[in-house]
């Protein structure tokens, strides 16, 4: 298995170096290697290994960085129209490189990607901001949410290469984006902040790339922010100890200062393996006009190969994150199949064959046949091309395909001639589909219709395939949707995108994790049944036991913050410490076994607060264990409010019920009769409050006399209230503001 240029089994003592390095020297080398960054003729030479005594050369000896003897030519100039791209000749696989950029949160992935785009001429120097963060929510939050692809043309040593760069998110909630991006890549740039070193998501992404057999190029970023040698030495030592990647393989960059970019591009061309695949035409309509049965046509048909392509992302024009075709030069109108808002745009990696417009492809799983209206690359907008050939990453437009009719991860194929059958097609190894871990009900805002919300969610799910959807019906809130997400941040981002891209304001119920139960009399091998407040079964109704999801949470934090985090994890979040390892003089790694419900309830926010933002957290797939669960129902005037039902531990039911009824009491308007508020577990009341009725002062005119005169008035008033309560028909009206306040009490 290839991991960069190192062997993981090589003894560590053979890889350690004894010299010291100054980050000032590294930055001076970066400046030297990029001194001609604006030159369109040649790239600067790196210093030779036999130089000694200079400020730039001795520090490089420690890392064994090979000097670059290649020259970088002028980048392909940007085009104002699509005509040059429509005639783009196919690149041989030997001149294609597919690379994904992965790293922990805020380690400089997007900034480095933008620096590469500017250095290669894809973006102009006047464009400010992070270009690959296209979504409004990405720019507002300052994080990458959707993986973005861009094709780059690089001329090196007189040869033109096509680099497909994929910028990925770093947050744990968006690992599905990273997984899909790695499936379409041949290598991964593993970025590490030189000042912060390896974090939890760094290792998660490293193992994800390692499992796929990808080449890994380690890169230290933000070198301009390093003020001493210690952080660099510590980061390099962490890389060796944790990943086995050699120091001499590490590349140094400063995207902010545009330093080290050429050396990085050279390393991508030299060290990333080219894609493997079969070249050839894949559909009869791709053949030139020849007489049927002619020797030339028969010879060309013999050389045809079936198309195989991996579909790893999709969107519609309404939720494409700003990806559009650029305006043609001179206001010309270019006809394209991408003009219809209902068309589906898919990102594909071509494994074998050729894909062109008008090619009819088949989805391997659903067996649905669709005609490609347009194909092209992203540079940095949608640029139509004549074809996509083996090894290339690009987009394909289909006409009015519903999102639920295909799955991201599908294999697209063709059978060009009769000698090929479906049995000859080997599906492209895609990526493991993930299961949602957090569920919440989405209800339309007052005055909105559920149909509009459902249509908006369906369109957004085309771009968010990890989100699941099921219909809901609540007497208090009306019709809604139960959506499943990969985490709390994923849910919040989805809600913000609904508002920003479709104008849908929604009421979101408290998020719950996926509980399960085992039916009575079932075998251990039988799959567990999902358990929600709508499908709840008591033990006497056929449930043998209930199960709760647990995860292993990995935290990397500074040593001075460990005690505070450990105390909170054990006291408030039912954590169980599995092990603790000292990484270096400043940091420790600790692993906890913790219920997923407690982690989603705010554990990560507490960790960030206690560590002043310096801790990182990662967690794996949930494992289900038995738990004493109950369902808490809330009754308002003896009518059950299903939107406020919640599943929790039996020991927590009284406190949760008390918070809910107290919130209702504080927000409900008093009426002429008492309103009882009850929280029940089965038939047992675990919490109760009463909204007292308004009372008229019936003794206001009685100023003297015996107390019995007042008591008679009070008794008459009490009997009247009882008669009024018996005549009351229907339940108390709860508007969404009252329900939202009560739902907020559940999440405390």
Curated annotation (Swiss-Prot):
Recorded topology in the membrane: Peripheral membrane protein
Domain annotation tr-type G: ranges: 94-276
Domain of life assignment: Eukaryota
GO MF terms held by the record: GTP binding; GTPase activity; mitochondrial ribosome binding
GO CC annotations, alphabetized: mitochondrial inner membrane; mitochondrial matrix
Gene3D superfamilies on file: 3.30.70.240, Elongation factor 4, C-terminal domain, Elongation Factor G (Translational Gtpase), domain 3, P-loop containing nucleotide triphosphate hydrolases, Translation factors
GO biological process, one term: positive regulation of translation
Location within or outside the cell: Mitochondrion inner membrane
EC number from the UniProt entry: 3.6.5.-
Enzyme class, broadest EC rank: hydrolase
Catalyses which reaction(s): GTP + H2O = GDP + phosphate + H(+)
Organelle transit peptide: 1-29
Reported function: Promotes mitochondrial protein synthesis. May act as a fidelity factor of the translation reaction, by catalyzing a one-codon backward translocation of tRNAs on improperly translocated ribosomes. Binds to mitochondrial ribosomes in a GTP-dependent manner.
Name of this chain's protein: Translation factor GUF1 homolog 2, mitochondrial
